[in-house]
Amino acid sequence: MIINMSKIGRNDKCHCGSGFKYKKCCLIKDDRRDMLKKRIKNISRKDFISGPYKKCPKCDENTFGVFLHTSGNRYRRECTNCWHAQSYKFPPLKKKIIYLDQFVISNINKTLDPDSSSHKKALEEPFWLEVYKKIDTLSKQNLIVCPDSSFHTDESLLCGDPSYESLKEVYEHLSHGCTFYDHNTITRFQLQQHLANYMAGDPTKHLDLNAEHVIHGHPHEWTGKMRIGVSMRPYEGQLESIHKERKSHYEGLKSVFERWQKEKERDFMDWVKEEAYAFGEGTIKSHIAHLKKRAELPHKYAEQYLTGKEPEINLEDLFPPPSSQIIESMTIEMHRHNLRGESALKKMAEYLRSKYIIDIPIIHISSLLYGALARKAAHGQKSYPNMGTVTDVNAISSLLPYSDAIFIDNPMAALLNERPLKKEIARYNTKIFSLNTKEEFLKYLDEIQTTATPEHLAIVEDSYGDTKPSFNLLKNKKQSKEDDRYTI
């Protein structure tokens, strides 16, 4: 049904069928829609040119602005008067990579969002506003980058207040299009590299922990003036899957914690080695279980069809688990060495059960952390680790080696500061901060600021202009979201 909107009076019934008067229902929405349509219709090239403006070398008008760029090693100026254009090259960059734990993102969000129920409480801690100011400014000056991760996504989805969309806006704003690969992918990448060294007869060779190999995006490129994001809702069953996995991990940790409490005579390194070597056995058992389940599926589905039942298809049964992906990547390495069939399987089993498996950074760090938890349990700790402990261990073990600094919660930072963890973790040259060392973190950020040369800052000023922190980040997001509702 097509309605002539011009014939609807303010006091007429609304065209949407709600039964309310037009002025009380869709009038504002329709006016905003018309305004946005006109704005879109009138978009021109000038809309993609912004300040800082300076005098054009051709027409002498102060209309020589910066053309919109997303990222890369060049930027372009164009004159909105005579359309003269010039291209400029950015110098190479080496930014500091800083990983911020989810609770940092959450507190920054509460500080910036006046509508948050925790806004006033967050402002009682001046640190959150101060740290955001420094991080946002350094990010805009292309001195640091704070990649987001799947841990941020999952934790944000589970959070009710602040909302997922609001948290996502904060961590994507600070990440500038850089996202760490997920925990399982990083595990597989490290194992592939370590296995190659093992097969080459050099299992103790240090891995190349280049952050660019485990980050989507380009952490050491100049960031763009425009950030492109995708607004995605959780897929069906995603929240349930995250809850189920967290609960399973927590129950497993509680069970092993109770065992640790009884192991009062064990040495710290016994627990560390136990955790490390459990990775290989766990990978093998998980892969075998997947193969058995896959082999049973045709019979299961056929039986359901023949008995007139609708097949219960579980996607988790169809897609290979992380353990099977690891075995598949190991098989490829075996083929490079002309090993196939039984000989390849024996070699893979030999490797996964070898003493060298503990040298893989992600296994090394996680084993140390679980060893530290076991030691606390054996020495009398009564309370269980919290629900997020496994997530914290996974995040730290996978992302710490690729970060120049990480800001994590106090309990995890305290574990990493214990002996011998502190000495072992030192090999990764990563600075570790928490709320207990928040002043040191602010000082660290100030030190990064002092490394910026006058030439670097001049380029930033010429290509980006204002680098002041975006205090209206969430207000602008809400307005943009409101506009999106009325866009056709």
How would you name each of these model-derived features?
Residues 1-41:
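Acidic/negatively charged segments and metal-coordination signatures
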Residues 2-9, 43-52, 67-74, 90:
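Short, flexible, mixed-charge glycine/proline-rich loop motifs
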Residues 21-28, 71-85:
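Cysteine-rich micro-motifs
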Residues 38-46, 52, 65, 94-96, ...:
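Extended charged low-complexity segments that act as oligomerization/scaffolding linkers
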Residues 46-48, 53-59, 79-82, 109, ...:
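Acidic, PIN/NYN-like endoribonuclease modules and their adjacent C-terminal/linker elements
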Residues 57, 76, 81-123, 276-317, ...:
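Metal-dependent nucleic-acid phosphoesterase active-site entry motif
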Residues 177-334:
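Non-catalytic, alpha-helical, charged scaffold/linker segments
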Residues 304-393:
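Long, positively charged binding patches that form subdomain-scale interaction surfaces
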